[in-house]
Amino acid sequence: MDIDPYKEFGASVELLSFLPSDFFPSIRDLLDTASALYREALESPEHCSPHHTALRQAILCWGELMNLATWVGSNLEDPASRELVVSYVNVNMGLKIRQLLWFHISCLTFGRETVLEYLVSFGVWIRTPPAYRPQNAPILSTLPETTVVRRRGRSPRRRTPSPRRRRSQSPRRRRSQSREPQC
């Protein structure tokens, strides 16, 4: 079977392949980021989003791969064979897991549309001959600030800003903080 884990999210393995392997942070850094930002939602029994589900699955797969690597390390007698297996897991499987973790963490952090736009921008940039492209590659975290997307049928923005509304002098009521997971 030819299964593309990014297909339902509007991306593809090919689109992510434009990013060099050293672009992706280490698995440890990605796991720490996922935990710091999304731990409550990832551990929740509630369904938050397809990205949360995919992130859970990638984290579980990596855990199982580490169990396999530990087992191989303990049970394979030949050091050369053991090194080959561990190296294969780290290089090939590690890259795929790093890509998955990066993609879903980025989609949750920046939004799917922004991440897809970044992947396309980077793909165009990397395929453009160096003499004809900007010196620096696109940067994901700056896309929301610099990208202007105009929808069809909308009138262009007015040139003069509307007058500011006077703010109420009374303090704003805060929403009660619930203990439910933040998705």
UniProtKB/Swiss-Prot annotation:
A Gene Ontology biological process term: viral penetration into host nucleus
Signal peptide: none
Motif interval(s): Bipartite nuclear localization signal: 158-175
SUPFAM superfamilies according to UniProt: Hepatitis B viral capsid (hbcag) (SSF47852)
Disulfide bonds: none
Region (3 X 8 AA repeats of S-P-R-R-R-[PR]-S-Q): 155-177
Family: Belongs to the orthohepadnavirus core antigen family.
Subunit structure: Homodimerizes, then multimerizes. Interacts with cytosol exposed regions of viral L glycoprotein present in the reticulum-to-Golgi compartment. Interacts with human FLNB. Phosphorylated form interacts with host importin alpha; this interaction depends on the exposure of the NLS, which itself depends upon genome maturation and/or phosphorylation of the capsid protein. Interacts with host NUP153.
Name of the protein in question: Capsid protein
Organism: Hepatitis B virus genotype B2 (isolate Vietnam/9873/1997)
